[in-house]
Amino acid sequence: MTKPIITFNNVSKTFEDSGTQVLKNINFDLEEGKFYTLLGASGSGKSTILNIMAGLLDASSGDIYLDGERINDLPINKRDIHTVFQNYALFPHMTVFENVAFALKLKKVDKKEIAKRVKETLKMVQLEGFENRSIQKLSGGQRQRVAIARAIINQPRVVLLDEPLSALDLKLRTEMQYELRELQQRLGITFVFVTHDQEEALAMSDWIFVMNEGEIVQSGTPVDIYDEPINHFVANFIGESNIINGTMIEDYLVSFNGKEFESVDGGMRPNEPVEVVIRPEDLQITLPEEGKLQVKVDTQLFRGVHYEIIAYDELGNEWMIHSTRKAIEGEVIGLDFTPEDLHIMRLNETEEEFDARIEEYVEMDEPEDGLINAIEEERNEENL
């Protein structure tokens, strides 16, 4: 990892008036030029992290570093960090130009330089020709672009975005996801984005921190978070999941619904109770006799790109299936899946425990160098 631009070291926050602890020993390093997302439900602590980073709140304990320098006591205006708030915080009595140029005027930048940089920045956010437009006459998407332009015109090291897309309609929100991601990559500025929207986080991020009750419960790439949730909370919070109680018989063999199935997971105790995750899109509908499981269709909804089918097995477990095939309510269908479609979770495992287990298991499972060399020599002799 390169030198981090932002570091949180055992950062906690308790509001003294209520005694409520909203952050518990937060630790992370953020690299320069990446798109990070703090993802969690309301009250999870994600916006508190953003406010501490910006200097709007003080940490109760722990240390915050910017480029290796401790900034706990550094004033907001001395931090090379800019924030885009949920309500955009624009000046309604000013024009687009005046809003974007505001910070430069405070720094007493030359007027010609201000005009040049405002023009360049508005071009970046696709607002060329809007310089003299009143803020009150702009659409929600246009106001957001103005707020982003104002945040990036000084070319800060870090831009913080506190749920800036939440007030937009679905189509515009999707368009702005593409625009924000493309802008961040073009500028090479570190973006820290706060949202409760899982799809938004998966679509835009290089790295996601999943938060719950003031703690980071899992961090990783969007693919890691979606395909390898470490516990019930993450699996249930990120996308749709079928979560079934099971038993890990041995490495690569799991039992649930009274049957044994091959898997690609290992490193657990023999006969350890586990939870099995299968995503709805990984279930294939078959004839009942051809499926690994049989379920009875209860209800279905048409979601546009697929049907969302709810079915129940003979043990009463609910199954969600995403399929392009329309089902018939009351019919019995088969469900098929591959070993790769099963993700096995230990009960209540933390991210630290998960990482340690995987590291230990991989080391135990790797062949020794001497054995690898012997195999290669044997193959070479056979080819002579």
UniProtKB/Swiss-Prot annotation:
It comes from the Bacteria. Residues 6-238 form the ABC transporter domain. GO terms for cellular component: ATP-binding cassette (ABC) transporter complex. It is a peripheral membrane protein. It catalyses: ATP + H2O + polyamine-[polyamine-binding protein]Side 1 = ADP + phosphate + polyamineSide 2 + [polyamine-binding protein]Side 1. InterPro entries: AAA+_ATPase, ABC_SmlMolc_Importer, ABC_transporter-like_ATP-bd, ABC_transporter-like_CS, Mo/tungstate-bd_C_term_dom, P-loop_NTPase, PotA-like, Transp-assoc_OB_typ2. Its main location: membrane. Keywords: ATP-binding, Cell membrane, Membrane, Nucleotide-binding, Translocase, Transport. Part of the ABC transporter complex PotABCD involved in spermidine/putrescine import. Responsible for energy coupling to the transport system. NCBIfam families: potA. The complex is composed of two ATP-binding proteins (PotA), two transmembrane proteins (PotB and PotC) and a solute-binding protein (PotD). This is Spermidine/putrescine import ATP-binding protein PotA. The lineage of its organism: Bacteria, Bacillati, Bacillota, Bacilli, Lactobacillales. The gene is potA.
